[in-house]
């Protein structure tokens, strides 16, 4: 049974009555850095905060080093302040799962899961420990409307990537950098694994005013030679087809990983699928990869994201904040996210 978290709009300390439901999120934070952006996120008074992965940088085959990285994050004053003020939810990406770009063959994935659940203490921890992976789902309520949060696990079951062994033979003027991977088209390749796909199909049948799908890696971008859902085109299409098959409306994605922020819009589905990427809280990158689906951005400074939902106004707003304040804002109407 999905835990139902009730956020009453009548409680003055929760800013739902005038502002609706507010979900803050971010990714890519190094445990040894100041993480001052977490204090900025706290100042937005969100109803929940989602860590989208690379919540620590472990990069190891030693479980003691993973644990030490979590302990370092636990001692960070800005993390402590955020934890005291708002409910935290989390999934993982590669650097906190274990190693850069790894998938289902990472040998410490079960030990890593135990440390993840011990650190974040997810509300459904008992249920989470009963199956492989760390995928989770939650329901929040505001003004009689349910808002669903689905946290995917894009590491535990992900097939191996197809590495470009000779980059010089794969040069292309469209990519002003050295690509690492090619798309994988084999039928048995997977991002989520069959068990998680079956679970996701059930979650998408749960009635909700808005469904937020959290993926550590970007969903709505084109292939760019780095890690994205587009490395597994069949899986990307499977997601679109599943949303259509269950006739799930009002779905949006949030993602991290890439060390910059942007809003993407995938118009190849039956209705536009938006993906608000926020990365990183402390980590940065020198450039943004090509993305024909980019609607806004990129924001190259350290950042965090916010989804602000006002169901009674039929509105959803995408926001990106940096140390200097608001950098990206886009409001859409929920009826844009409906089958025609």
Where are these regions (language model features)?
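Bacterial Sec-dependent N-terminal signal peptides
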Residues: 1-19, 243
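Metal-dependent phosphoester/phosphodiester hydrolase catalytic core
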Residues: 17-340
């Amino acid at each position: 049974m999905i835990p139902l978290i009730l956020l009453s709009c009548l409680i003055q300390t929760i800013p739902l009555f005038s502002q609706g439901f507010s979900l803050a999120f971010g990714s890519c934070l190094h445990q040894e850095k100041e993480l001052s952006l977490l204090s900025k996120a706290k100042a937005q008074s969100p109803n929940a905060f989602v860590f989208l992965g690379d919540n620590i940088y472990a990069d190891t085959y030693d479980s003691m080093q993973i644990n030490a990285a979590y302990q370092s994050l636990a001692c960070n004053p800005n993390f402590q302040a955020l934890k005291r003020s708002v409910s935290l939810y989390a999934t993982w990406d590669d650097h906190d799962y274990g190693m850069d770009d790894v998938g289902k063959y990472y040998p410490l994935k079960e030990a890593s899961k135990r440390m993840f659940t011990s650190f974040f203490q997810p509300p459904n921890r008992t249920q989470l420990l009963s199956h492989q992976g760390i995928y989770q789902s939650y329901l929040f309520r505001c003004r009689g409307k349910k808002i669903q949060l689905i946290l995917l696990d894009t590491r535990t079951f992900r097939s191996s990537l197809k590495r470009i062994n000779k980059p010089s033979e794969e040069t292309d003027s469209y990519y002003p950098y050295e690509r690492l991977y090619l798309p994988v088209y084999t039928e048995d390749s997977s991002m989520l694994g069959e068990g998680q796909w079956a679970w996701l199909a059930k979650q998408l049948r749960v009635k909700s005013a808005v469904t937020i799908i959290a993926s550590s890696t970007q969903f709505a971008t084109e292939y760019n030679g780095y890690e994205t859902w587009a490395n597994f085109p069949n899986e990307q299409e499977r997601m679109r087809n599943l949303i259509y098959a269950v006739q799930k409306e009002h779905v949006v994605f949030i993602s991290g990983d890439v060390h910059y922020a942007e809003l993407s819009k995938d118009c190849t589905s039956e209705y536009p699928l938006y993906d608000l990427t926020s990365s990183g809280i402390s980590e940065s990158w020198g450039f943004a990869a090509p993305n024909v689906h980019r609607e806004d951005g990129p924001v190259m400074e350290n950042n965090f994201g916010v989804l602000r939902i006002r169901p009674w106004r039929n509105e959803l707003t995408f926001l990106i904040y940096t140390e200097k304040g608001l950098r990206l804002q886009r409001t859409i109407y929920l009826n844009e996210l409906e089958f025609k």
